[in-house]
């Protein structure tokens, strides 16, 4: 506005009260000052650069909206938005101040406001104006003041200025005074007529008039602050009726105008209270802006009734006082017929519940007719008289009913029909399930129990098999972690295998994951000869299936077509002597019992794979099974590998060659335990006529991992399922799962940061540094729990420095990291900045110092 400081504040407050009082609205001075201070905080440019025009005022509104989004709506004064909206309507209707700015573009805003304020404040205090006396003197004085600021030339040049320009300024100010005097009312009617009787359109003033103006200007002094005169407060006086421009009798606005003239208040909203309490408040009707209705209808049509933006518009509408009839009219005008019926039903239910809850309270009674707008409150005119508390309840029920409208295209079905898709991730299914449950009932213990039950019952068959071991003891978070292995790649591979076998997806999953004992699925037992279901091998009538396929080239001697178990050669095709054939493991069908040897028990060869390390390459018949009921044959790595995230997909050799059994196809899938440890196996298909080496595609899923030579990393499924007399590693599987695959280790790369590791001590989690130079584990004093007993030791710890006053745990502590655990007696050092994990723990965790060359690796 061109004026800052206390003078600018008083000017703004005066103008604000004056403009609003002309519309019949009263604003306290304290509220106006609070709004001005908030305006400076939101738009600091406004006092110096802004003006009361529609463009700048809309910019202020946008900045108020951003301020509310950043600091919350509670940080905005309660009168800020109503004042801004009223001024926007005034500026839209081309208020007097806007017209003044448009007419006097050559005069700066600061000069015109100061001149206008001084003129109005002085003229309002005068009792009589005279036809050519006081008014002309005041105008001439203001012209002289403005001329002193407008012209920067010396006094002599001012005398030579064009008189026509001065006359233009006089004519502009006269027009402003004329409009201001017209708004003073009956109190100055007589003086206004005399003042307006002057011929303002006369371009040339007579010499007598100019003499009168100069004489009055000599006695004119305005030493007071620039405060526009405002109407005095009238205690308990009903505000004047709102002065509105006549609406054109066309369209929706014309229909509303005609209805108001005839006394029809069907669409009378919102209700505006003019005071601060229910006793003094006199409800006044104001129409809801048509732009708001159009915005709400557009949001419902384009984004749906339950979209976040639509709900924001509904909240904006709910910020006003709307009666039940208003809400019904708004919902009927913006919602589709079906959604309106849903909204009305929910609104009635919410209202009945609220009346029942309020029945036992001693406060003002709230009847169902008040909330629904029925009975004696059926007419809109009677609903206007409802108290604020009742209107708040009406708005609350209306908004809750609106939020209960489902999104477009979503049918309200029972929760039992909300099932997980075959290719849908489990966490996405849980998200949909929680959204549906929370729409029906509030969050609480009951909803959590229902979600957990449906999370098991409505999951797909693969996730149900993964959740089954922890169904009763686990939580929803445990279910999600268990189903992380059910990645889309695994599901896609399983679906492809089921399609090749000609089975349903659910049936194939049950057979693959042990849905029936001995390979018996939902369709009955599976024949190990022909691969079909419904009968066993001894009852198989397929003659082709009863005959054993002819053997290929012997993998032992490479010079005959016979089975390896029947090979009697002592030399291979190159004349090299062959080791004696292990008849107890090859010729007999007895299983190899016991666990696979640990890395410490075996040096070279294939560790823990069940394969003979002295006779590579291997065939399909040499691959072992984990247990007799295992569906897949184990594929093992034949070299040491270190995988990082940067390596991408790598090929792991298995040294398995040869064709698959006739009529079968191989599917390579990963093991669930490996994925938990950070190793991801990509599925692959092996054709029946493939004769090369089978390799496994792997990559690091989370961080760097180590694969030792001989570790089982994948499984080979023969489709259709064929039970071959392969060796078995373990007689019974028992309850083992997700951790039976060994030797895929935790790895941390050495970087600029310290190698830190989380370890549990007596169930408490500690973060410490891997210190290969520490013989014993040392716990920092700040990490040690106060209730754990310790005792002082007479010895001191010495390394690069020396630590005195060392304590030690009075009781042994059990440590645990992943599937490894042990007992330690750690030291407690008060001055230690962080915990140090010593070699007493690292050797049991199997921490290894490795490089890209496995020969340079060293175990701790």
UniProtKB/Swiss-Prot annotation:
A GO MF label: DNA binding
Record lipid sites (N-myristoyl glycine): 2
Gene Ontology CC terms, in alphabetical order: viral nucleocapsid
Catalytic activity: dUTP + H2O = dUMP + diphosphate + H(+)
Sequence motif: PTAP/PSAP motif, positions: 305-308
Residues forming the catalytic site: 771 (protease)
UniProt-listed Pfam families: dUTPase, Gag_p10, Gag_p24, Gag_p24_C, RVP, zf-CCHC, zf-CCHC_5
Highest taxon in the source lineage: Viruses
Site (Cleavage): 99-100, 195-196, 228-229, 254-255, 269-270, 496-497, 745-746
Region span, Disordered: 151-191, 572-631
Presence of keyword ATP-binding: no
Bias (Polar residues): 584-599
Biased composition (Basic and acidic residues): 151-169, 178-191
Keywords, ordered alphabetically: Aspartyl protease, Capsid protein, DNA-binding, Hydrolase, Lipoprotein, Magnesium, Metal-binding, Myristate, Protease, Viral matrix protein, Viral nucleoprotein, Virion, Zinc, Zinc-finger
Zinc finger (CCHC-type): 525-542, 552-569
One GO-annotated biological process of the protein: proteolysis
Protein name as annotated: Gag-Pro polyprotein
Organism: Mouse mammary tumor virus (strain BR6)
